Amino acid sequence: MGNKALPSICYDLHSHSSASDGVLSPTALVQLAAENGVDVLALTDHDCTDGHAEAVAAAAEAGIRFIPGIEISVSWHKRLIHVVGLGVDGNNSEMQQGLVDLRAKRTQRAEEIGAKFTKIGMPDVYEGACALADGVVSRSHFAMYLVQQGVVKDVQQAFKKYLQQGKRCYVGCEWASLEDALKWIHGAGGQAVVAHPARYKMSRTLFREFLIDFKVLGGVGIEVACSSHNLEEATQMAAYAQEMGLLASAGSDFHSPDNTWAKLGRVHPLPEGCQPIWKDWD
């Protein structure tokens, strides 16, 4: 896949803490990143920047560089897309107001998911998911509770059986528009990156249409290397990045040490020919 040697600097620019749907506190996340050899870490919690201050302090203690980030849920052509913002100012008022609105939607959706579980004879699932969440309840908290109770063997099975689109307890939502999400990220001084793009299973034509919209609105990057991409998908995303003039990012999308498919700092190197998102960082 191009560069076989490990890069001199290890970047992991997509991770989650207990401020959203990760299981580790921001401090524990940073400590694990340092143990795993990560040099530059971005915390990109879903629709939330609450973990930034704690992570900044932990990164200073651990001696690694911290990039304040965000992962925003976007609705585009009735599809859920995740957009990562890197280098955002968590105190930006316009972005924070947008995130407040998104978290309110998450809360409403969680209640509706809980009602669906009750309807199929599982009335304790909503309360259990709430107990696992430090903040807003997400589908991942429902999945973690189902694993905890032995209903499913792992988080992936919980999604496949109950929580993904088309399953019994799935609830759709109208998230932020692509235009709004990129406006918030840019207004907060950040760079907008398409998260785990191969996961969306779009046709080539539709994906190019999305990337055109994304770039026109100011998007600059695409996650080429991430835990959910195999080597073929990473190579394909690298080709899209070069075709569309987008920078390449790399991130594990880490949520939990128990998720063996998404280990913190364990990301394939970028394929040759990619321009990394960090190329102009100081």
What does each of the following model-derived ranges do?
Residues 210-224, 262-282:
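Structural recognition of alpha->loop->beta junctions
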